[in-house]
């Protein structure tokens, strides 16, 4: 089966990993803008998380930190040293588990950085990009994470994308396409974890 592999890591990343907003009106668009209204609105609207607005001009860490559903994840990102990379000018896609998903997760300091960077895919992959990759790769898109491992995205029914980790556990995407200045957040209902194989992750 042909598989799409997303490789590489954004240059300059630090540490181990390098209510909806209102739609714009037609009067806000310059006549020279080649984008359609639908394309522009999709770039300027965001879902809310836990009742909090997610602002597209914030970086990923700022938006995650403003979510009441992700305080455990934010603490883990900071403790691991991975948080700094999510404030850079690179482009990242984060599969962000909720507090409820992380409640039973063991916070082993020795492996925390690895586990946090496994949740991050270098590059900007919204739901449309993921769907395109899934279709192009025959039903399963393999995503290379910042940790060096692999996540597998596939369809579960006609509209739902699920993500499987290296241990075979599958997470549903509960909230899609939270757009940030430096990437995309997808809220997931399970912590995605790498396997036990140690990998050397490049530090830029």
Each model region followed by its residue ranges:
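Sec-dependent N-terminal signal peptides
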Residues: 2-22
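Mature, structured domains of secreted/extracytosolic soluble proteins
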Residues: 3-5, 22-204
């Amino acid at each position: 089966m042909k598989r799409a592999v997303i490789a590489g890591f954004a240059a300059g990343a630090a540490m181990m990993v390098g209510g909806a907003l209102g739609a714009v009106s037609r009067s806000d668009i310059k006549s020279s803008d080649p984008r359609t209204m639908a394309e522009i609105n999709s770039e300027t609207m965001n879902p809310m998380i836990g009742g909090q607005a997610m602002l597209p001009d914030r970086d990923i860490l700022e938006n995650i930190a403003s979510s009441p559903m992700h305080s455990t994840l934010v603490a883990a990102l900071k403790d691991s040293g991975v948080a700094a990379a999510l404030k850079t000018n690179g482009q990242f896609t984060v599969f962000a588990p909720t507090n409820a998903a992380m409640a039973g997760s063991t916070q082993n300091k020795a492996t925390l950085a690895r586990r946090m960077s496994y949740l991050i895919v270098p590059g900007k992959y919204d739901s449309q990009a993921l769907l395109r990759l899934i279709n192009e790769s025959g039903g399963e898109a393999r995503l290379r994470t910042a940790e060096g491992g692999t996540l597998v995205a596939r369809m579960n029914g006609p509209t739902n994308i699920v993500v499987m980790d290296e241990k075979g556990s599958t997470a549903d995407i509960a909230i899609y396409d939270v757009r940030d200045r430096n990437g995309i957040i997808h809220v997931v209902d399970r912590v995605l974890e790498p396997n036990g194989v140690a990998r050397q992750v490049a530090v830029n």
